[in-house]
Amino acid sequence: MMTEYVLILSAYLFSIGIYGLITSRNMVRALMCLELILNAVNMNLVTFSDLFDSRQLKGDIFSIFVIAIAAAEAAIGPAIVSSIHRNRKSTRINQSNLLNK
């Protein structure tokens, strides 16, 4: 019974993240939506790991790897955005084509 609620919440988070990535024009907002997507994936991994085989921790361990990747993205992403903002004076995605310089 509780599994369905967690999966529905994960689907909502994933949908909000995808919608935000598609419609956002700001790089910071796109990074935040990417974090939402990664957290929804982590919720699915842990839920299905517990649902199908709770003795093996494959989903939990893979979730830890995804959290590590998200932490690296959260550390490197704002640095890249601030560098682009310093050079281009904008964080809008459509104005930051680096190949036109």
Curated annotation (Swiss-Prot):
Keyword Membrane in annotation: yes
Q: How does it sit in the membrane?
A: Multi-pass membrane protein
Classification via InterPro entries: NADH_UbQ_OxRdtase_chain4L/K (IPR001133), NUOK/Mnh_C1-like (IPR039428)
Give the UniProt record's GO annotations in the biological process aspect.
Answer: ATP synthesis coupled electron transport; photosynthesis, light reaction
What's a single GO MF annotation on this record?
quinone binding
**Entry superkingdom:** Eukaryota
Q: Which family does it belong to?
A: Belongs to the complex I subunit 4L family.
Entry function: NDH shuttles electrons from NAD(P)H:plastoquinone, via FMN and iron-sulfur (Fe-S) centers, to quinones in the photosynthetic chain and possibly in a chloroplast respiratory chain. The immediate electron acceptor for the enzyme in this species is believed to be plastoquinone. Couples the redox reaction to proton translocation, and thus conserves the redox energy in a proton gradient.
Protein name, as recorded: NAD(P)H-quinone oxidoreductase subunit 4L, chloroplastic
- Gene, per the UniProt record: ndhE
